[in-house]
Amino acid sequence: MSDLGRGEGTGFDAERKMQFLYQLRQKGVMDKRVLTAMEHVDRGAFVRGHFASRAYEDVPLPISSGQTISQPSVVGLMTQALNVQPRDTVLEVGTGSGYQAAILSHLARRIYTIDRHRNLTREAEIIFTRMGLVNITVLTRDGSFGLPDQGPFDRILITAAAEDPPGPLLQQLKVGGVMVVPVGQSDTVQSLIKVTRLETGFDYDELMPVRFVPLVEGTARD
């Protein structure tokens, strides 16, 4: 079994949950369905080693392959902006730790999550199986091209920064669908953008400043 930090010794007990949800509300996460989903997903299961003791702090933390697990408030705000509906099919680009996909799995009918790092997708699959999350499909792919064979999607969430919303992914969004994506250079503060596909094109709404690792083409050699 992979040596994954599962949050043992920290405990996502009732008191921690109350504090965790309070800090999410303080940062603007108010959607009840999102809060309930985040209450049901123990972030400690996705944080490795000695960082597990900080799993419930509102900070990003390092994971494998030079990547990070985003701070909970950013995860909550991105999920809230995505406005996922129960019958939706969602594409997540950038599996990372798997935490975001696990939350989405409580909100949507089907989740496809892809990452260029095989070790990350493998570790995420182990955690999803352990949690009994059966509506998530995990694939090792070049995320910048999405999954055209599975689209179009009701919602697309990109958890890495692109210089512009990727064209192939925009084309995989249903009319009426929503994409949330960080846009900007990797070495500067980026903007979180909400894209809605209309009959006649796309509507863009700037939400807030963020910092994410860059969206990189190709698959990693790991």
Curated annotation (Swiss-Prot):
It catalyses: [protein]-L-isoaspartate + S-adenosyl-L-methionine = [protein]-L-isoaspartate alpha-methyl ester + S-adenosyl-L-homocysteine. It is an enzyme of class 2 (transferase). Its main location: cytoplasm. Coiled coil: none annotated. GO terms for biological process: methylation; protein modification process; protein repair. It is found in: Cytoplasm. It comes from the Bacteria. The active site is at 70. GO terms for molecular function: protein-L-isoaspartate (D-aspartate) O-methyltransferase activity. Its EC number is 2.1.1.77. Keywords: Cytoplasm, Methyltransferase, S-adenosyl-L-methionine, Transferase. GO terms for cellular component: cytoplasm. The keyword Transport does not apply. Belongs to the methyltransferase superfamily. L-isoaspartyl/D-aspartyl protein methyltransferase family. HAMAP family: PIMT. Catalyzes the methyl esterification of L-isoaspartyl residues in peptides and proteins that result from spontaneous decomposition of normal L-aspartyl and L-asparaginyl residues. It plays a role in the repair and/or degradation of damaged proteins. NCBIfam families: pimt, PRK00312.1. PANTHER family: PROTEIN-L-ISOASPARTATE O-METHYLTRANSFERASE (PTHR11579), PROTEIN-L-ISOASPARTATE(D-ASPARTATE) O-METHYLTRANSFERASE (PTHR11579:SF0). This is Protein-L-isoaspartate O-methyltransferase. It comes from Jannaschia sp. (strain CCS1). The gene is pcm.
